[in-house]
Amino acid sequence: MTLDDIKEMIREIPDFPKKGIRFKDITPVLKDAKAFNYSIEMLAKALEGRKFDLIAAPEARGFLFGAPLAFRLGVGFVPVRKPGKLPAETLSYEYELEYGLDSLEIHKDAVVKGQRVVIVDDLLATGGTVYASAKLVESLGGVVDSILFLTELTFLDGRKKLDGYDIISLIKF
């Protein structure tokens, strides 16, 4: 198994979720035990030598890679969720989408001041979701060590939105 094999497994769905979008569907990777395990191993390898305390990931697809990666590396996992999904007191960050505004929330006690956090998501597109996640971590006093993606859509220039952060992506489209 190689990252090229994983890339070939990611299928493109035209006009999803709306016309003109070419959606990168990772579900074939998730359903294949060897491919999914290899993806987690390669994400773990990308973080070798780094010192951090937590992995944070935005819902929903960030959870698919962030939680197993945290388990694999023996660190805690912090979910970053849509409004109203977390039960305790939260902090919120509003961000712009192509078609309006959205927001994400994190528990106020999810990160202790000075903790180093890696943010994990499945895909870097425009960067808005992980930017909001990073701002939430920082607002709690955490330090964003790096932002890690399985895939990146380079033509959308999401790295520009994340300027100043250490960005790692394993597969580029």
UniProtKB/Swiss-Prot annotation:
It comes from the Bacteria. Its main location: cytoplasm. Keywords: Cytoplasm, Glycosyltransferase, Purine salvage, Transferase. Pathway: Purine metabolism; AMP biosynthesis via salvage pathway; AMP from adenine: step 1/1. It catalyses: AMP + diphosphate = 5-phospho-alpha-D-ribose 1-diphosphate + adenine. One of its GO terms (biological process) is AMP salvage. It is found in: Cytoplasm. Its EC number is 2.4.2.7. The keyword Nucleotide-binding does not apply. GO terms for cellular component: cytoplasm. GO terms for molecular function: adenine binding; adenine phosphoribosyltransferase activity; AMP binding. InterPro entries: Ade_phspho_trans, PRibTrfase_dom, PRTase-like, UPRTase/APRTase. PANTHER family: ADENINE PHOSPHORIBOSYLTRANSFERASE (PTHR32315:SF3). Catalyzes a salvage reaction resulting in the formation of AMP, that is energically less costly than de novo synthesis. Homodimer. Belongs to the purine/pyrimidine phosphoribosyltransferase family. This is Adenine phosphoribosyltransferase. The gene is apt.
